[in-house]
Amino acid sequence: MRYLTASLLLVLGVVSFAFLIKPYLHGLQLSGYKTSGIYKSKKFKPSICFQTGTVISFVIVWVLFYFVLNREIWGLILALGYLLTNLFSVVKVAKKKYKKPLKFTKRMIRLFLFAIAIYAAILGLGVGLMLGSGVETYFILLYALLTELTYAHIVAVSNVIALPFEKLNNRRYVLAAKNKLIKENPIKIAITGSYGKTSVKNYLAEMLKYKYKVLATKASFNTPLGMAMAIGELDCHDVFIAEFGARKTGDIAELMNMIKPDHAILTGITAQHLETFYSIENVIEEKHKVLNVDGIKVAADTDMIRKLDGVLYVGKNDGDFCKCDLIESSESGSRFIMHIDESTLVLKTALLGEHNVMNLMLAATMAYKLGISLGEIEDAIINMKPIPHRLELIKSGNVNILDDTFNCNPQGAECALNVLKEFDGRKIVLTPGMIELGDAEKSENYLLGRKIAAVADRAILIGANRTKPIYEGLISGGFNEREIFIFETLEKAKSNFSALLGGGDTLLMLNDLPDNY
């Protein structure tokens, strides 16, 4: 009977572990497999707290029942109760919906199986030793219960142990990608910046298609492995456009070494990822590394971008290679005059906002220097489609929705509010605030609140604690407190849209936090 109970305990314990570690695996994946992602993730902390609270509650009951008769039977009853509690947790975890669900990639499967093996060893060894020592079943069940306190830590340890192998494995993919790049030998263009990378990449790809067969990295796959995946699709392409992402010092240098681009675009620099860069000076230094190319260098003419020889600047200043001296934005799009080289074009686009016009001009400058005619560039700009979630105008009945949920920086937020200002009717802003701004996060969100107060008629805030600086900024800016609505989740806010929105309203959805916030 004791051995049958122990066997059942091992099976049920391992199955329970396999299901209940999902939040920790998810937090790890969302943080780029940084072990700290398990513990820092704000949406997965409740899982750790719930498990710990459940274990402590049952341990207290277990200790109290030690003094009753037939405690072995009571132990089995308590174990059954605990099993039902875990079953409830499993169902709860399975039902939870996420914007980016946990993906069981090859790496995740390896980590998952490794963590299960470690837990099975801990549980099996402990139960085996206790059985061999004649420890009664009551305490064996208690030991199995206490092992649940190790769930998150086992995932963390598994990740640390697996890291050297994963680095070697990643290096293999990167090396294969580098070799394929050498073999295919396309024109390689690198694009980086604190904002606008994906937009400029997509706009440039559309312009270059008039002359070249183009492959660009997908979505925001801007890490070495993302590059490797994209390079795997190279098939007699003339041009490869690589979007470079950077969260810390050294990231751009690593990608430059991998891709060895011929040409580069620097879209702009602002205070972003300061939690991992630690200072704006580090951001500036790292982003400028993309301009270490022998070919065409294009950069936005902004305060944080240095004036360097051989760089073609894009902006609104005299002396810029590509200059915009008039921008008119409306609900139907943007009109602007573009001076490039010694030519002038009067252009119209369906894209909204000054920042999108600047992104078009950055792409146009590179395309022009790579042999795309001004007529083709004009045609591409006229027919350019908005990129999803980047100030995309969506009509929902009589309500205009400006979807800018992929915007997460102060400059982009200001541009989006300037676009909102151009719309007629009541103006509403929905936001959870901005993240990854380091020590400046509170002050920047406070300023965002003041800027919203100057434009909007109603504010919908997601998360009371996180948006407190925005709330304070709104009040400081003279905003009507009765027009501020706070919800803990975006889903709850959406369920109240029928009461919050009316015909003729324009709703700006500014930023959307990832699942680990």
Which sequence ranges carry the predicted segments?
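Short, well-ordered alpha-helix to beta-strand connector turns
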Residues: N185-P186, K211-Y212, H237, P261, ...
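Flexible active-site lid/hinge loop adjacent to a nucleotide/diphosphate
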Residues: T223, L234-K307, A350, E422, ...
